[in-house]
């Protein structure tokens, strides 16, 4: 009996120990599962295992500006190319050796200015030959007329036949015809001599010379001597969508002529002010646009042929428009858009249509309302419905002033 009771007591102790171990294991498992994952911060959201949600993300600092209303002229705008009002390739009209160039590359020349000289000696010889033939035939005509007068007096006394009189009269007529031809030859020889001195056909700026002195040139040369481009005045050729044509025609009917402004490629600086010159007579079916030409005096030479500019046509004066900073407007696959800040300081992407640029602002045609706030800085971090913190723009030099005050 004592052996059996000992075995029972030992088995009971083992069972109790096993139960205790199981309880300790359960407690340890609960503690391990409740512990935060390795590397987690001590924020309440992460300790509870909750994922970041609405209202729990950190606000993104941005700068914003309100959409404002202003009185401004209304424009139609398009991309244009500056073109010379006249372009002339100066070519020689006669063949010969180029003796002298009288212009500098890039120089402004006037109509009639001497540009080049060709060796004149062959043309002088031709002129002298023509003048000699004219003098000879003039003398022959004078002699034939005197003979005709004598024949006429003798014919009255029947001392010469009628045939001889008619022959002498025909000789006078023939010599007169020779004189007409001789005078034409003299004029032609003089013209060829004049052509040996090449003059500017009109006002313009001389380009790079196409041939050097000493070369033999001819009237068949396609490159010519130099190209002259008239830049005073100068034109800008641009296009407008066919949807803008009704506004353009209405403005022409009311104003007669329209003010045109040429701006640089960045659309930040006005280069020149001119007027609408002409419209094409048909719409380009391939692009759905109408070609338009504007003219500028260009006395300061700020416009240059083949330069790309932004062209604006003023179609109305002092119209109420909405303006936003140009820095707020972004371009994506869906077109132009801005980030609009709502009353809860959350941002939303908004597509919009813009018009002409006015300095650092853009005219808004559609997409936002007056008073709405649009993000102007900090845009690269924004996503739809992100929470933002609008901060004031730092005054230029403020950081440097702050560092100076902190230095001992």
Swiss-Prot record:
GO terms for cellular component: efflux pump complex; plasma membrane. InterPro entries: CusB_D23 (IPR032317), Multidrug-R_MdtA (IPR022824), RND_pump_MFP (IPR006143). Residues 1-28 form the signal peptide. HAMAP family: MdtA (MF_01422). NCBIfam families: PRK11556.1, RND_mfp. Belongs to the membrane fusion protein (MFP) (TC 8.A.1) family. This is Multidrug resistance protein MdtA. It comes from Edwardsiella ictaluri (strain 93-146).
């Amino acid at each position: 009996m004592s052996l059996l009771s000992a075995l029972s007591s030992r088995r009971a102790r083992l069972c109790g120990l096993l139960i205790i171990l199981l309880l300790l294991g359960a407690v340890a498992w609960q503690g391990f599962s409740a512990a935060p994952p390795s590397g987690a911060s001590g924020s309440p959201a992460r300790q509870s295992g909750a994922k970041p949600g609405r209202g729990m993300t950190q606000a993104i600092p941005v700068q914003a500006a309100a959409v404002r209303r202003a009185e401004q002229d209304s424009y139609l705008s398009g991309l244009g190319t500056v073109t010379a009002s006249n372009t002339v390739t100066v070519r020689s009209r006669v063949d010969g050796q180029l003796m002298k160039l009288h212009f500098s590359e890039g120089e402004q020349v006037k109509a009639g200015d001497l540009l080049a000289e060709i060796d004149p000696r062959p043309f002088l010889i031709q002129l002298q030959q023509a003048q000699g033939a004219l003098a000879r035939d003039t003398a022959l005509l004078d002699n034939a007329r005197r003979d005709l007068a004598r024949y006429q007096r003798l014919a009255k006394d029947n001392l010469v036949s009628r045939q001889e009189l008619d022959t002498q009269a025909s000789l006078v007529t023939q010599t007169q015809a020779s004189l007409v031809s001789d005078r034409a030859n003299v004029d032609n020889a003089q013209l060829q001599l004049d052509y040996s001195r090449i003059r500017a056909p009109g006002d313009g700026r001389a380009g790079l010379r196409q041939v050097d002195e000493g070369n033999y040139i001819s009237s068949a040369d396609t490159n010519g001597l130099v190209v002259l481009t008239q830049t005073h005045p100068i034109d800008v050729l641009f296009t407008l969508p066919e949807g803008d044509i009704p506004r353009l025609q209405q403005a022409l009917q009311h104003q007669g002529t329209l003010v045109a402004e040429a701006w640089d490629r960045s659309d930040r600086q006005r280069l020149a002010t001119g007027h609408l010159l002409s419209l094409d007579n048909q719409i380009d079916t391939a692009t759905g646009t109408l070609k338009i030409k504007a003219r500028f005096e260009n006395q300061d030479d700020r416009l240059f042929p083949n330069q790309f500019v932004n062209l604006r046509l003023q179609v109305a004066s002092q119209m109420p428009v909405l303006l936003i900073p140009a820095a707020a407007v972004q371009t994506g696959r869906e077109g132009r858009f801005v980030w609009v800040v709502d009353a809860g300081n959350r941002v939303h992407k908004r597509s919009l249509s813009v018009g002409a640029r006015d300095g650092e602002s853009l005219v808004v045609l559609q997409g936002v309302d007056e008073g709405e706030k649009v993000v102007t800085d900090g845009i690269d971090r924004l996503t739809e419905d992100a929470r933002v913190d609008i901060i004031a723009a730092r005054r230029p030099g403020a950081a440097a002033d702050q560092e100076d005050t902190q230095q001992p």
